[in-house]
Amino acid sequence: MFKRKSTAELAAQMAKLAGNKGGFSSEDKGEWKLKLDNAGNGQAVIRFL
């Protein structure tokens, strides 16, 4: 089983990943779009890449 050598090393890796701006952005409006029909019912197409 996997055992961590150092929690400080893990924390440094997490901090490095948290600063990554190339990942998922919640501001991306292209992930899903809501469409309304004439009755006001909504449909959404969710795309996972």
UniProtKB/Swiss-Prot annotation:
One of its GO terms (molecular function) is DNA binding. Keywords: DNA damage, DNA recombination, DNA repair, DNA replication, DNA-binding, Metal-binding, Zinc, Zinc-finger. GO terms for biological process: DNA recombination; DNA repair; DNA replication. The keyword DNA damage applies. Gene3D superfamilies: Replication Fork Single-Stranded Dna Binding Protein (3.90.198.10). Interacts with the polymerase and the uvsX and uvsY proteins. Homodimer in the absence of DNA, monomer when binding DNA. Binds preferentially to single-stranded DNA and therefore, destabilizes double-stranded DNA. It is involved in DNA replication, repair and recombination. Binds ss-DNA as the replication fork advances and stimulates the replisome processivity and accuracy. This is Single-stranded DNA-binding protein. It comes from Enterobacteria phage RB32.
